[in-house]
Amino acid sequence: DHQVDPRRLCGAILEFLGDRVVPTRASEVLFNEDHRAIGLRGANGKSYRADHVVLAAGVDTGAITGIPQALTDLLRPVRGEVLRLRVPEALRPLVTRTIRGVVQGNAVYIVPRADGTIVLGATTREDDMVGVRAEGVHQLLRDAHRLVPGILDCEIYEMTAKARPGSPDDVPMVGRVGDGLTVSMGYFRHGILLAAIGSRIGADIVCGTEKDNNPALLAAVNPFRFGNR
């Protein structure tokens, strides 16, 4: 597989956008008297006007006032451990391409980076533990060792367990949900992989050209496909 570093990609996008990025969290969708979305209120208390509002706030989307609850109730946080390891100089390159495998029913991926580090992931769990679960770390190292034994000689320099936004069928929810209001959420484990197509659909909706997309694709990601309108 080809691969991209999500952190470097996001950093590059922010750098490209420059001062067009407002460093605050959205707290409320603003509507006019006709109930058309006209902007957002940030956590900093300031209001930001927009011709069309696109919400892509991940698992925190439900915390934004003004989104139909029938939509936000469908999102659930799915946590999972990811390890980042540094390969010793003597073992480089430990792997030269992305490895995906299934070990005793558990999916595992090993992604090499150009700087000699490796991303190892990812577990999936739906519980209340916010931090890194020891069982998840053990599972990842055990399964990765079956695929690449040298993984145990690497240095663990970071462990994370972030919440990913899952929909009922684990497929994104992208579409217009009100006049001037579009959501793009529920990307689950594949946010970076589906970012290009998700942003394309969102942009087409804003520009009024969504009909140029495959109807089956639009139906597959329709936020109201669960009968929740």
Task: Please tell me what each predicted stretch does.
Residues D1-F16, G58-D60, G136-D143, Y187, ...:
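Mid-domain beta-loop-alpha active-site segment that forms a flexible
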Residues D1-N44, Y48-H52:
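Helical element adjacent to the flavin cofactor pocket in flavoenzyme catalytic cores
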Residues V22, V54, T182-S184:
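Hydrophobic/aromatic beta-strand patches that form the interior of the parallel beta-sheet core
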Residues K46-S47, E126-D127, H190:
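Short, surface-exposed beta-strand-loop junctions and turns on beta-sheet-rich folds
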Residues R36-I38, T117-I118, L181-T182:
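Hydrophobic residues embedded in beta-strands of well-ordered beta-sheets
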Residues R41, G121, S184-M185:
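Beta-strand residues in well-ordered beta-sheet regions across diverse protein folds
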Residues H52, A57-D179:
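Active-site substrate-recognition segment that forms the wall
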Residues G150-R229:
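C-terminal catalytic lobe of FAD-dependent flavoproteins
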